[in-house]
């Protein structure tokens, strides 16, 4: 992608795209691998530092290309070791990236959009509306910046980042091409060499793009479910009105079967006090997912101002988990991490910007959606 300087940002190019770039400037394709290693393995953003690239080629690259990561506005470290970066992208909006360390892994939670158009009622990101899609360079740039912050080399065994989850701000499947490109760089040995089993894309349920996903990439899939029936999910996750549960689960099953192997869907379920945490909800969930190879990740709600929701008691959380476990499911309850720096699940809002502002583009998207719904309603009568 060409930046405001008129140069091509090499940070977001996949290996084939990098090879095409070197073709276009009359250079050998093997240079693509050299430059990708400098960028992603060693965190280099200055062509002058690429010691195995000749001076003439370095000067040529300086004239037509650049390596421009997004700008780090702030970095916060939680008492539990969780880190959160606020990052400003080219549109002027801010997004957030979170690193969660555990004993056996380091997981980076990456954003795909500034804001989100899906307006899930319990998610603070949705409250700020949709601002912009991130470029491939801005998506993979979050991985680049995190590695740079840790001073680690991705190719080493003791790498800081072992897993990446597309679970930050935004709906990844509504920024399809850029997210796919970034995930390819994550998994490329010339990029970050992360196993496909350790890269997870989370979706609220954009069915046409789930159906398209297997044609382009092989990664783990997570579904933001949050309700065991259509009536409740319509309220919590409004996209369910367009793609109800039966259609959505069929699409997820289709993705897993297309790729083959022992695929398991990760089901994410945010527990909201007295809303979706009752025994009858657990019973409905057991019935809904009975034939779906899945593991269930329960997420106790992380409060934010004016949400209108509360976190269930620990007893209610344990009861819900036990009911699902007795129903035959592999169930874990996510430990809240980074809530003291507003980095917990559902708390990402790009706080440097005015969180109440909705861009003209977002308003137009919502109006178009409303117009389509009115037309559909009129056609059905």
UniProtKB/Swiss-Prot annotation:
Location of the active site: 96 (proton acceptor), 345 (s-methylcysteine intermediate)
Keywords: 4Fe-4S, Cytoplasm, Disulfide bond, Iron, Iron-sulfur, Metal-binding, Methyltransferase, rRNA processing, S-adenosyl-L-methionine, Transferase, tRNA processing
UniProt-listed Pfam families: Radical_SAM (PF04055), RlmN_N (PF21016)
Required co-factors: [4Fe-4S] cluster
GO cellular component, one term: cytoplasm
Any one Gene Ontology BP term: rRNA base methylation
Cofactor comment: Binds 1 [4Fe-4S] cluster. The cluster is coordinated with 3 cysteines and an exchangeable S-adenosyl-L-methionine.
InterPro entries according to UniProt: Aldolase_TIM (IPR013785), Methyltransferase_A (IPR040072), RlmN_N (IPR048641), RNA_MTrfase_RlmN (IPR027492), rRNA_lsu_MTrfase_RlmN/Cfr (IPR004383), rSAM (IPR007197)
Molecular function (Gene Ontology), one example: 4 iron, 4 sulfur cluster binding
Name the UniProt record assigns to this protein: Dual-specificity RNA methyltransferase RlmN
Species this chain originates from: Pseudomonas putida (strain GB-1)
Source organism phylogeny: Bacteria, Pseudomonadati, Pseudomonadota, Gammaproteobacteria, Pseudomonadales
Originating gene: rlmN
